[in-house]
Structures are given as structure tokens and as C-alpha cells.
Amino acid sequence: MEPELDLTLKLGLPNSTVETHLTLSPPTTTTDQGTNVVDGGEVINHRRGLLGDDEVIHNEPTRNNVEFNIRIYNYVFQQFVGAPNTLNFAPYPMPPSPAPAPETPPVSDEYVLIDVPARRARRNNSTVMTNSWKENATPKRIRGCGGFCGGRIEGMKKCTNMNCNALNTPMWRRGPLGPKSLCNACGIKFRKEEERKAKRNVVIVLDD
């Protein structure tokens, strides 16, 4: 009991402070770590005064705990105390917001969008890939059709419906881009949709 009393008197610290801050075990809780961060320099000096430099250097658990506190203390010191103009903190500038991308207008003079069954769309897209023009393109396909005949793939006719892309069809039909711009299926669907719109417009006029 007497050595403990002498130790407390030499350090000038109450017993509670010695027991709280001079533990030899690594910090295990957030509260302990926070205490060691704030009083990092004092804790290290108290341990060296209590244990001696030899114990701090050669005792592995003690050395690890001291090194841990040194790293934490140095980090806090460099971030706050050692920073120039410590009292004049300026908010970190936020990066400027990127300029909004310009809206891409629909290329209405090159293609249209009409819903088609997914199975037919996959089949037609596969056909487009396998029939893309290379060295073996036949003169007939290169010539294509006379006049305006919808989309083309290097001279080959193609349905202008971007969801369809049909290359082969019993006949080409009129679409939003003109005559023979849609395949047979898309042309029929487009015509029926136009008829439904016309009927709805008639009903609206009669109601008014």
C-alpha cells in the first residue's frame, strides 16, 4: 500500500487517474481510444515515467500499446494542431456540378419506334448481324430498291422501326417516314394505330 501511495505522490496524480490512464492493456473500447487520443502525449510520458524507458522498449505488449497511442496522437496532431492557420479553417470546396448533358432529340427522319414482340425483335437483330455487308455482298443487294425505301444497311433495305430492323418482308408498307419505310408487320400495326387515333379524335369532336 505504501509503494502505491509514494507512486501517486511522485506523479502528482490521484489514484483514479493512475488506474484510468496508465493501464498496460491495449484500448478495447471506443471511450478508451477517445481518451488516449485526447491525452495521447500525457499518457505516453506518464507510462515512461512509471515504467522506465527499458520496460517500454523491451516489453512487447507495452511497446505495442505505446506505439498505437503515438500513431493516433501524431495523426491528430498533424490533422489539427500542426496544420497552418489552425484557427482559420475554410470549408473544403465542393466540386462543381457537371453540366447537364444536352438532350438528344429523337432522329425522327431516320427511324421510328413501334413496339414489336420480343421474339421477332431478337430474330431480326440476329439476321441483321449475320447479313451485315462484307466482301460477299451481291450486286442485287447492293442496288437495293429504286427510290426511297426506308432504312438501309450498306445498300440493303431495312425496316425503319428501330425495335424491328427487319430485312426480309413480303412487302414494304407506308410508315411515318414515307412509303415502303416499314416492313409488312410494322406497316400494318402503324396503319391500325392511325385508324384508332382517327376514331378517338372523331369521338372527342362529337362530345364537344
From Swiss-Prot:
CDD domains: ZnF_GATA. Keywords: DNA-binding, Metal-binding, Nucleus, Transcription, Transcription regulation, Zinc, Zinc-finger. Transcriptional regulator that specifically binds 5'-GATA-3' or 5'-GAT-3' motifs within gene promoters. This is GATA transcription factor 29. A zinc finger (GATA-type) spans 155-208. The lineage of its organism: Eukaryota, Viridiplantae, Streptophyta, Embryophyta, Tracheophyta. Belongs to the type IV zinc-finger family. Class B subfamily. SUPFAM superfamilies: Glucocorticoid receptor-like (DNA-binding domain) (SSF57716). GO terms for biological process: regulation of DNA-templated transcription. One of its GO terms (molecular function) is sequence-specific DNA binding. It is found in: Nucleus. One of its GO terms (cellular component) is nucleus.
